Amino acid sequence: MSVEVDKHRNTLQYHKKNPYSPLFSPISTYRCYPRVLNNPSESRRSASFSGIYKKRTNTSRFNYLNDRRVLSMEESMKDGSDRASKAGFIGGIRETLWNSGKYLWHTFVKNEPRNFDGSEVEASGNSDVESRSSGSRSSDVPYGLRENYSSDTRKHKFDTSTWALPNKRRRIESEGVGTPSTSPISSLASQKSNCDSDNSITFSRDPFGWNKWKTSAIGSNSENNTSDQKNSYDRRQYGTAFIRKKKVAKQNINNTKLVSRAQSEEVTYLRQIFNGEYKVPKILKEERERQLKLMDMDKEKDTGLKKSIIDLTEKIKTILIENNKNRLQTRNENDDDLVFVKEKKISSLERKHKDYLNQKLKFDRSILEFEKDFKRYNEILNERKKIQEDLKKKKEQLAKKKLVPELNEKDDDQVQKALASRENTQLMNRDNIEITVRDFKTLAPRRWLNDTIIEFFMKYIEKSTPNTVAFNSFFYTNLSERGYQGVRRWMKRKKTQIDKLDKIFTPINLNQSHWALGIIDLKKKTIGYVDSLSNGPNAMSFAILTDLQKYVMEESKHTIGEDFDLIHLDCPQQPNGYDCGIYVCMNTLYGSADAPLDFDYKDAIRMRRFIAHLILTDALK
C-alpha cells in the first residue's frame, strides 16, 4: 500500500474523532481564465463546486482517486452542513454519516472509476472525455453528492477578466512517485504571464489600426477558438472557480449573414482616406470638370455684360466732366455782376448835395416810424382804459346785485313749515335725485349738509350755467380709489365732451367729516383747490390736485391738462365746524359766476334758506 493510502487512512481516523472537521482547506482559491471568445456579450460567471475543471496529468490511479476523494468529501461535507441547518442537528449527523459511508464504499470497494456503462476510465484519455464525465457527475450525482442548484450561485459574481487571483493547488502524492509538481511560485508566475498576455493593452500611433486588422465574419465560431476554450476550461482544481455560462449567441432578427469588417465598403473607404489612398472616381471627376466649364461660360457672359456697363459709365463720366469744365470756363470769363459801360465824373458840390439829400431821407423815415409807434401806443392805452372801466362796472353791478338773495316773508314761512314737519314725506324727485323731509332738515341752522343736498345744488349750478359740469360727491371717491377706470363713463352720462366745457366743479368729502371743493377752469388752464378750514397748501391738497389733473389728461386723451397750473385758492374761512357744506355751495356759486370769493358769514346764513327755497320750488324743472 502506498504512502497516499496511509495518509488517507490517518485523515479518516482523525475525522472519526471529529466528524465535523473538513478534509479541505477553508480558504477558497481562485484561478484566472481568459474570456470566452465565442460569447463576448456574457460578463457574469457562476461559482460552484461541481463544475470545477482540473488540469489533467498523467499520474497513477491513486492520484486520480485522491483528487476524486478530496472533491467528493468537500461536496459531501458542504451538503451535510447545508442540510443540517434546515433539518436540525440530528438530521445533520445522519446525513454526514450517510455521506461518509458512501465515500468509504467508493474508496475501498470500487477502487477504479467507471463510466455509466461500467467501463473503466483510461488514465490517458483526452480532455474532452474527462470534461464530459465531470459534467455528468455534477448533473447525475453518481457518488451520492447533492445536486447543483441554480440558487447556489453567487449574487455578486466576479469578472475574472479583470481579477487575477493566485491558484493554490494541493496534491496527495507519494515521495518520488508520479509527475513532479511545479512550485507555487512558478505556477503563479505562469498564470500571471498568461493573464497579462490575455488582458494586455497596447497603444499605437495608429489609433484605429486599419492595416493590422485581421477580421472574420461576425458571429462565426472557429474551431481554434473552441479547442482553446476547451483546453482552458479542462483544468480542474479544488476550491471555487468562476465559470462563464454557456449561452447561445443571439442571432440576427432576419437571420441575415453579417459581413466582416474587412469586406465592408465603409471600412475600406475609411481606410483609404486615413492612409491617403482614396481617389475620386472617374465619373465624379468628369462631372466636376463639366460643371467647372459651365461656370466658366457663365462667368464669360457676365464679364461681357459688366464690361459693356463699365464702358458706358466711363463715357458718361467723361462727358459730364467736359461739360463741367466748359461751364467753369464760361463763368470765369463773365464772372462780374456789374459791367461798367460808361464812366462820368462828378464834382464835389454835387457829391455833397447828394449826401445831404440822403441824410434828409433817413431823418424823414425815422419821423414817420416814430409817428406810427406813437399811434399804436395811444391805441393800447385806450384799450386798457376801456378794460378797466368795464371791470369797475362789473364790480359795481355785483355789489348791487347779491348772488345770495334774501327771501320774502311768504317764501320764508314756507321754508319754516317744511323744517318743522314731522312726517318723512318726499319733497322732490327729479333727475334721479330724491329729497325727503329728513334730507331737508339738514338745512336747518347748525346742521351738517348731507350729500343729497350738495348733489341737488351741484345739479342746479350745472343747469343754470352754460358749458359747466358739476359732479356729485361720489366722483372724487371713485377717482381716488379706482383711478380713471372708475369714472371714465361719467362724462358720457353728461352727454358732453371735456374740450367743449369751461369749468368743472367736484365736491370732495374728506374722511366723511369735512367738505372741500375742486375747480377745473379749462379756459384759464388752472386746477384750484378750495377749503374753508385750511390755512394754505398741504400734501393732501396737492394729492387731490394731481388726481384731478390726471383725470383731465385721461379724459382728453392727453390733449390737454399737462400744462395746467395747480393752485390753492383763498376763500373765506368758516367760523364754526358745521358750515363746511354751505361754504362749498357758496364757493361753487361764486366760481360759476366768475365772481371773487369775498362773501361773509351773513351770506352763509342766507344760503341755507336759499337752497331750501330752491328745493321747495323745484328749481330743476
Swiss-Prot record:
What InterPro entries does its record include? Papain-like_cys_pep_sf, Peptidase_C48_C
List GO molecular-function terms, semicolon-separated: cysteine-type peptidase activity; deSUMOylase activity
Identify the catalytic residues. H514, D531, C580
Query: What keywords would UniProt list here?
Result: Acetylation, Hydrolase, Phosphoprotein, Protease, Thiol protease, Ubl conjugation pathway
Taxonomy of origin reads: Eukaryota, Fungi, Dikarya, Ascomycota, Saccharomycotina
- This chain belongs to which protein, by name? Ubiquitin-like-specific protease 1
What species is given as this protein's source?
Saccharomyces cerevisiae (strain ATCC 204508 / S288c) (Baker's yeast)
| Protein's UniProt keywords contain Protease | yes
Query: Gene encoding this polypeptide?
Result: ULP1
Q: Where is this chain compositionally biased, Polar residues type? A: 179-196
Tell me the residues on which N-acetylserine occurs.
Answer: S2
